[in-house]
């Protein structure tokens, strides 16, 4: 189906929602945002909505789970997907409905907590900048939230991995697989404050290239970062049970809810989930940067 035909199909669906389903403006907007997530995913996979099979939709659903989207949000998105394919069948675009056997996640299934941007701001504001580690801790939280790193990726981040003039960092992920991740101007600013303090430290031999150091001049461990974040959450009055991984999931959720392409989010997280193996063969760095600039709250114009 041509791009123009696809646009006409979506236009007819939106009209159907307005007239037949009598949807309000806000609900209609939400349905269209969720539909765009699916259509962007299918376009990246080279799939036509009129030819999609159950397996394709299961891969899309698995991708939502992989990036840590809460079960309730997954159910909402999949509800919109079902509505779309029911319309395609009703309107004669398809003879079948591939969503008939598509399962939704259990609402009660456990997924990590997610912080809002305001809660991340509270977390950072609770840090005492008069202490030697203040700017370091703020930079850690901001890099985790702005770049979506695993805690192990953060502890192993090197100065030689930073390309701050280009606003990218090189991350060594699972299985020693490298990826480039855009970094926000705010994260770069926080790193700059930390580097001003870092240059006055006595650094142990062999540790000079690590970005984040403890007071003894050695690189941080995962446990050190976990303890720091839990203490700051308590200081900020955040009642949620959080960890460094919470900030990674918050990064992914903020991007998805902001309208970013699911495949791009998976690439930024360093995932090789179902249907997304070798995703970097399809997504270049300019696309990654554009998605971050357009859809992450640290970059969106307010």
What are these regions (language model features)?
Residues 1-302:
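Conserved catalytic core of the tyrosine transesterase superfamily
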């Amino acid at each position: 189906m041509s791009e123009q035909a696809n646009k006409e199909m979506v236009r007819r669906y939106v009209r159907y929602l307005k007239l037949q389903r009598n949807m309000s403006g806000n609900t209609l907007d939400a349905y269209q945002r969720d539909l765009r997530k699916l259509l962007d995913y299918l376009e990246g996979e080279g799939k036509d909505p009129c030819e999609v099979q159950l397996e394709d939709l299961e891969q899309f659903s698995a991708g939502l789970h992989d990036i840590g989207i809460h079960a309730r949000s997954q159910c909402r998105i999949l509800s919109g997907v079902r509505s779309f394919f029911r319309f395609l069948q009703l309107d004669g675009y398809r003879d079948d409905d591939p969503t008939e056997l598509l399962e939704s996640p259990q609402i009660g299934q456990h997924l990590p907590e997610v912080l809002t941007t305001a809660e991340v701001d509270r977390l950072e504001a609770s840090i005492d900048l008069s202490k030697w580690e203040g700017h370091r801790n703020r930079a850690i939280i901001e890099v985790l939230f702005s770049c979506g790193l695993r805690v192990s990726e953060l502890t192993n981040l090197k100065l030689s991995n930073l390309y701050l003039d280009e606003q990218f960092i090189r991350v060594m992920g699972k299985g020693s697989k490298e990826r480039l991740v855009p970094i926000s101007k705010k994260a770069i600013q926080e790193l700059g404050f930390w580097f001003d303090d870092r240059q006055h430290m006595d650094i142990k031999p062999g540790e000079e290239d690590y970005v984040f150091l403890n007071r003894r001049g050695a690189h941080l461990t995962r446990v050190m970062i976990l303890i720091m974040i839990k203490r700051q959450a308590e200081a900020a009055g955040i009642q949620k049970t959080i960890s460094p991984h919470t900030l990674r999931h918050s990064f992914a959720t903020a991007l998805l809810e902001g309208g970013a392409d699911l495949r791009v989010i998976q690439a930024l997280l360093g995932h090789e989930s179902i249907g997304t193996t070798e995703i970097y063969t399809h997504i270049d760095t300019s696309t990654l940067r554009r998605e971050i600039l357009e859809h992450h709250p640290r970059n969106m114009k307010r």
